[in-house]
UniProtKB/Swiss-Prot annotation:
Keywords: Ribonucleoprotein, Ribosomal protein. This is Small ribosomal subunit protein uS10. Belongs to the universal ribosomal protein uS10 family. The keyword Cell division does not apply. Involved in the binding of tRNA to the ribosomes. The gene is rpsJ. PROSITE patterns: RIBOSOMAL_S10 (PS00361). It comes from Synechococcus elongatus (strain ATCC 33912 / PCC 7942 / FACHB-805) (Anacystis nidulans R2).
Length: 105
């Protein structure tokens, strides 16, 4: 089992809105630093672009198409030397609904 110095929490964040993601990252890093834990990040990961091709016409005209895309922005934050106060503060943190959070200990 890892000792307290070797423990780390890895937080992966995903969102469609980059600004919402960045504000969430800032809040997590600020909370970790306030509880005397070392926060590394946010580390930006490659943005995933998903492109959808749709026919404009409901019937014929296959030549007329329209493209839509969704961009998924991702970040990683590593928190080293977390204490019980750090974990409690992160659990109480209120983050926006548009951000998907995955936590690994």
């Amino acid at each position: 089992m890892a000792t307290l110095q070797q423990q780390k929490i890895r937080i992966r964040l995903k969102a469609f809105d980059r600004r919402l993601l960045d504000t969430s990252c800032d809040r997590i890093v600020e909370t970790a630093n306030r509880t005397n834990a070392t926060a590394i990040g946010p580390i930006p990961l490659p943005t995933r672009r998903r492109i959808y091709c749709v026919l404009r016409s409901p019937h014929v005209d296959k030549d007329s198409r329209e493209h839509f895309e969704t961009r998924t922005h991702r970040r990683i934050i590593d928190i080293y030397q977390p204490s019980s106060k750090t974990i409690d503060a992160l659990m109480k943190l209120d983050l926006p609904a548009g951000v998907d959070i995955e936590v690994k200990l």
